[in-house]
């Protein structure tokens, strides 16, 4: 998947319960049924959500009930525990994370990023810090 990141094409990895592996390439020819901006349509995770999970599996990732059918694994390394226990799953999808340019492009449209799509390091610390003034 890391090698596919360098291309302008959206690529998704798929591993099936039977152990077959596939590389899906999105050519940008699908008509989107949602009103997502072009910036959002360019996200690998939205291709997975709107063009695979929703129409083929009936899973709406915006519906909390449907999320019970999904397991999210973060990180750049292959999820070895899932691969070892592939019989517990029907499919494993590998999706590239968005780069900063994609995040900024979506932010400029006023849309929000899909769940879990901005899980990256280093995290920016947030909160309120106060310091005493004077003695």
Task: Locate predicted features.
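Surface-exposed, charge/polar-rich loops and edge strands
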Residues: 1-135
């Amino acid at each position: 998947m890391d090698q596919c990141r360098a291309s302008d094409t959206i690529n998704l990895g798929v591993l099936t319960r039977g152990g077959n592996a596939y590389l899906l390439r999105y050519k940008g020819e699908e008509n989107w049924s949602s009103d997502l901006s072009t910036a959002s349509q360019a996200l690998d995770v939205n291709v997975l959500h709107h063009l695979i999970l929703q129409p083929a599996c009936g899973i709406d990732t915006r519906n909390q009930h449907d999320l019970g059918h999904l397991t999210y694994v973060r990180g750049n390394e292959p999820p070895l525990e899932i691969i070892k226990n592939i019989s517990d799953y029907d499919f494993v999808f590998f999706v590239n994370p968005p780069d900063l340019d994609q995040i900024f492009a979506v932010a400029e449209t006023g849309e929000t990023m899909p769940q879990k799509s901005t899980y990256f390091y280093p995290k920016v610390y947030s909160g309120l810090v106060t310091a005493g003034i004077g003695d």
